[in-house]
Regions:
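Conserved N-terminal entry element of GNAT/NAT acetyltransferase domains
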Residues: 1-4, 158-162
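Conserved beta-strand hairpin/beta-sheet module of binuclear metal-dependent hydrolase folds
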Residues: 2-57, 84, 178-188
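Conserved HGGG/HGGXW glycine-rich cap/lid loop of the alpha/beta-hydrolase fold
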Residues: 9-12, 71, 167
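Short aromatic-enriched loop/helix-cap "lid" or pocket-rim segments at secondary-structure transitions
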Residues: 18-20, 98-102, 198-200
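Metallo-beta-lactamase
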Residues: 30-40, 136-147, 155, 162-234
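Active-site HxH/HxHxD metal-binding segment of metal-dependent hydrolases
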Residues: 41, 51-157, 184
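Adenylate-forming
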Residues: 46, 234-235
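A general structural detector for well-ordered alpha-helical segments in enzyme core domains, enriched
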Residues: 46-49, 74, 218
């Protein structure tokens, strides 16, 4: 993509069948941006990357743009394998710890009742929501026990280049995109996508959330970027 920036694509077992991940050269090692979900196929894909693309250097840092399973799922495995730290916003880290250990907010009876109260009455659809009680924990069975916090406006030095964190809301609790002036790149995660609409939802955990306003307001944070910035989306 650019000097020191490699584009990886890994499969997902959904209708949205892939995720774009990023490998950034970082001095004597590599920084991974986003992880893929926890399954054997994704682990095998990463092992192929480790065998062919690292040039003998280790992974020294894992960054997750946000807590969703396709972005954070394998963070525990990657950080344990390479004995490195996870970098993520505090809000998403703690939300992931909660979601991976409970059935809150992503499916089950409470979610079905919440959606029914807003007009979802189709029995088949409600049955699917009830069946998702273990949805998040199934793809994020573990979250690293420690992390380093990403903050809005924070500059992260990766390979001698400054990458600025841009917080976004509405899609995830506290999503962090990464923008590099020198390379004219924006790793947008799920906040800016080229073809599909970003998932902007309200869950039973925060029933009065105004997620759409949060998301639309967040988009204004990208308006100052130069027109020639290359956007690297997750899907």
């Amino acid at each position: 993509i650019a000097p020191g920036v490699r584009w990886l694509r890994m499969g997902l077992p959904f209708a949205l069948d892939h995720i774009n991940l990023w490998l950034l050269e970082d001095g004597d090692g590599w920084t991974i941006v986003d992880c893929g979900i926890t399954n054997d196929a994704t682990k095998a894909a990463w092992e192929q990357v480790f065998a062919s693309a690292l040039q003998g250097k280790p992974v020294t840092r894992v960054i997750a743009t946000h807590m969703h399973p396709d972005h954070l799922g394998l963070a525990h495995w990657l950080t344990e394998r390479w004995q490195c730290r996870l970098w993520i916003s505090a809000t998403d880290y703690n939300a992931a710890r909660l979601a991976s250990q409970s059935t809150t907010g992503f499916g089950g009876e409470r979610s079905a009742a919440f959606f029914a109260s807003h007009g979802l009455t189709d029995p088949e659809a409600l049955a699917k929501v009830r069946a998702r009680s273990n949805y998040y924990a199934g793809m994020v069975p573990n979250v690293p026990e420690s992390y380093r916090r990403l903050l809005d406006g924070m500059s992260v030095n990766i390979g001698g280049r400054a990458w600025r964190c841009i917080a976004g809301y509405g899609h995830a609790p506290e999503h962090m995109a990464l923008q590099c002036d020198e390379l004219k790149l924006l790793i947008s995660g799920d906040m800016v996508l080229p073809r599909i609409s970003t998932n902007v939802s309200v869950y039973d955990l925060e029933p009065e959330a105004d997620s759409l306003t949060l998301y639309l307001d967040s988009l204004s944070r990208y308006e100052p970027l130069a027109r020639d910035v290359l956007v690297l989306p997750s899907h």
